[in-house]
Amino acid sequence: MGGPRGAGWVAAGLLLGAGACYCIYRLTRGRRRGDRELGIRSSKSAGALEEGTSEGQLCGRSARPQTGGTWESQWSKTSQPEDLTDGSYDDVLNAEQLQKLLYLLESTEDPVIIERALITLGNNAAFSVNQAIIRELGGIPIVANKINHSNQSIKEKALNALNNLSVNVENQIKIKIYISQVCEDVFSGPLNSAVQLAGLTLLTNMTVTNDHQHMLHSYITDLFQVLLTGNGNTKVQVLKLLLNLSENPAMTEGLLRAQVDSSFLSLYDSHVAKEILLRVLTLFQNIKNCLKIEGHLAVQPTFTEGSLFFLLHGEECAQKIRALVDHHDAEVKEKVVTIIPKI
């Protein structure tokens, strides 16, 4: 390398390196305040039912256009983890700062710095302008590489950052190559863990539109297994994902072929939490609606015993749904009234 151009590249490299060193200083300075910040200021639970849940998710019809919907964000303006590059939660990094942060994330092996950098990137990815900038800077594979990390907290923070980045449809094109890996982590990792919830939330975001839903075909039975064994938060998050799939007629046969334990029908009992009960009722309704679209009717002999088809079309399921017409909650009763004619 020689001449003015070579000198310019050297100067640019030194400037970027200096900026990254400053990022390291700002991030590591947070250690002196104590690592407790990372634990206390946790991201919003991925499984918690939000107030004002989209009507489309609970009423058997889509409240979203074909290309958009209700996205699952891991950071809200009211409950953001601390942005450790500055003291303010509301500051938005510019493109140059984001580039330095991505360089730092890619070059450091310090787990504390990695985690803090991922939190900062995740916070900034909550803003639409930065979702595009991070993609254009090549940041998506840098963040996604951290879902391979052995540190579970780092893996979770990487998934959370991808959750916010996935709100951008163009970003999904780059994120989709990691769907299989995320599925493997979700179904092989600890039940009800933060990593599992973060992974389920990312899969939910990636299935808001129909574009990438087919990539989950081979994992549908696993989803139902997690649904039946997980806690309340996990159940709600799995159901959000299943509802996305159930609105797409192209996924109906795959859902009905899934092998599902008969304990699934217990989710239609009257004592089940409302946020779960409404969603399993909507799942039933969506599948029934899809079966009728353009004469797309299922033929019973094509489904094996033990499949979701046999559970939903059996008399036990019909009896449980009819019994809910006397449910104490008005929303549940209203939902049941609309479903009974379809039984």
Curated annotation (Swiss-Prot):
Which intervals carry biased composition (Polar residues)?
64-82
Tell whether DNA-binding is among the UniProt keywords: no
Its annotated compartments are: Endoplasmic reticulum membrane
Question: What are the BP-aspect GO terms?
Answer: negative regulation of apoptotic process; negative regulation of intrinsic apoptotic signaling pathway by p53 class mediator; positive regulation of growth rate
Q: Which GO terms describe its molecular function?
A: DNA binding domain binding; p53 binding
Q: What is its main location?
A: endoplasmic reticulum
Q: Which domain of life is it from?
A: Eukaryota
One Pfam family in the UniProt entry: Arm_2
User: Which Gene3D superfamilies does the UniProt record give?
Assistant: Leucine-rich Repeat Variant
Q: In which tissues is it expressed?
A: Expressed in all tissues tested with higher expression in placenta, liver, kidney, heart and brain.
Indicate how the chain sits in the lipid bilayer: Single-pass membrane protein
Q: Which residues form a coiled coil?
A: none
Q: Which residue windows are transmembrane per the record? A: 5-27
The stretches annotated as ARM repeats are 138-180
Spell out which residues are annotated as carrying Phosphoserine.
S45
Q: Which InterPro entries match?
A: ARM-like, ARM-rpt_dom, ARM-type_fold, Armcx_regulator
* Residue positions, PTM Phosphothreonine: T85
What is the annotated role of this protein in its UniProt record? Answer: May play a role in cell survival and cell growth. May suppress the transcriptional activity of p53/TP53.
Query: Matching PANTHER family, A to Z?
Result: ARMADILLO REPEAT CONTAINING PROTEIN (PTHR15712), ARMADILLO REPEAT-CONTAINING PROTEIN 10 (PTHR15712:SF19)
Comment field (misc): Depletion of isoform 2 results in cell apoptosis while its overexpression in cells leads to accelerated growth rate and tumorogenicity.
Assembly and binders: Interacts with the DNA-binding domain of p53/TP53.
Query: Per its record, how is this protein called by name?
Result: Armadillo repeat-containing protein 10
Give the organism's phylogenetic lineage: Eukaryota, Metazoa, Chordata, Craniata, Vertebrata
